[in-house]
Amino acid sequence: MRRYLVAAAVGAAMAMAGSATAAEVEVKMLNKGAEGVMVFEPALIKLAPGDSVKFVSTDKGHNAETIKGMLPDGGTTFVGKMGEDVAVKFDQAGIYGIKCAPHYGMGMVAMVVVGTPANEEQAKAVPQVGKAKQVFATLFERLAANKTAAK
């Protein structure tokens, strides 16, 4: 009987060691943050496939939504409601561009990088408006620096 209990305990431990739970990252939508005004904080989010992001409407008057064309093939689009939190699960590897619709031109954008992205050049080619162009250039530079540092 004791051997069976030990075997069952070892089997259960091995099953638990092989499983992983998905993570949820919280991103604040702010009128003013460490990087300036009208920002997502953090603006560069790295995830594993299956992880989620909860966009939190810390300051009212913001939303989070995908930018047309700036997501991988098979990636899910979403549009969060104004002034409300929205949680999004990212299953498809790739780069996702996120914007706050009313403050997009002011540079209120974020980049979600899931797994190993295959759509980086496609994402870079999407035209951006106003200050969003500069913010995305900075985010792509940070992404490249992180890749170089990881080698």
Predicted regions and their residues:
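Positively charged n-region of N-terminal signal peptides that target proteins for export
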Residues: 1-4
